[in-house]
Amino acid sequence: MSAVDTAWLRMDGPAGAMMIVSVMATATPVCAAELRRVLETRLLCFPRFRRRVEADPLGASWIDDGDIDLDAHFVVTRLPGKGGKHELQALAARLAAERLDPSRPLWQIHFVERYGSGSAWILRLHHCYADGIAMIRVLLSLTEQDAGPAQAGAQDAESRAGQRRDQGTTDPPPLRDWINQFSQPAGDILEHALAEGARLLEAGVHRLFHPDTAATVALQASGMVGEFAKVLALPDDPASPLRASLSGEKGVAWSEPLDLQEVKTVSRALGCTVNDVLMATVAGTLGAYLREEHEFDTAGVVLRASVPVNLRAAEEAMTLGNKFGLMFVDLPVGVANPLQRAYAMHDTMRELKGSLQPQLTLTVLGTLGMLPAVAQGPAIELFSRKGSLVASNVPGPQTPLCICGQRISEMYFWVPQSGSIGVGVSILSYAGKVFFGLIADRACVAEPQRVVDRLGPEFEQLLLAATVGALGLEQRNRATKSAGKPRQRKRRATPTKARRKTRPPAGNT
């Protein structure tokens, strides 16, 4: 097992295990037997899903599990009562707090054959197997492109998989498109971090055999050292209801999805990125929750979020494991004005462009994974005190996908919270919608639904403010252009008294 994956394995603590949790749903029912066949043919082809973990104080190893018992990993269950959203959230929360069986490969799917008018399933995967991006890649490998009800219903899972093999492809077009999209450098952050990381890794090997180049290596590493000093100098996040002694009891909730086009409308109107708009909406939601539910004075308060940043090169997009770093992002929860909050978020993200924090944290995790397990806990706690939540934003495929011939209508995921952090926010865009989810230790957020219910209204306020502001700006621009044009006097015959009209008073036109 790699050092970084080992570090994630060791982060399990009394308050919970480091599991990624995903919930997906279809509007029409999926057959359990057919989904099981899909798992056999498409999921178990990943060797890591057939392997269990064997750990010792110095590291961990992957052990082949032989003939894997799929029945232990694919559990068919029923929801109590009405079998709706509330019941599915309760099941997801319970499973998020339960540990996976360490004697087996560390993943499990609970399939709900009847959820509303369709079906749903909850995937749990230990973070040492894959990060969020890799997990979504695995989930998408189980799907196929939405080809319409008639065609989708006519083909079963095995024939669709065989069809792709005959065409010489291993993944459906939406997955390849998504991988290509996500593997593009996400602004200067990834581009700079990848370049610097590659230089440092190469220099690290070279200096073992060429001590005379130590000065050059030191210059190349100075940026990383400086970034490390900045991170260490960050103060602990301020005390708030979101930081409490963790209980280990989880709560899960999600909101109604936002329209991605409306989010893009706001981003264009404000000159911000889509990510700026979404993170500003999260900040506004948390601020409103703290003020209204806890009577917490947020004036001037900034809470820090730990944000995962993908560091996979394009050629590594199809591999499992952990290839991401973390970045500490200030959330302006104390800014009540939605426009000011969006601009503050934009300024924060702009200042972080070119930051080496993602590569730095990946390097730190790799180092911790190579040290004895006893040394890891204090270091993780040191970093976790600098934030109040984990916020993950993943751009998913915009082409609708199907599984077992049924269209996927909802898609949520949550990454684990390490150390003393007890709140996690997830953002996933899929098929023209933006899905928000919240997972939290009950000691930090007793009722997560009370948080996510505020997200829609917060975005509506931002949308309205941006729209009104854009209209006002357009009117001012038109007036400015009109005032700047010289008037041309037209010659005309002097009107007769019968044709004269009274000019409207100035200001009424």
Locate predicted features.
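Soluble acyl-CoA-dependent acyltransferase catalytic core bearing the H(X)4D motif
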Residues: 1-4, 12, 17, 21-421, ...
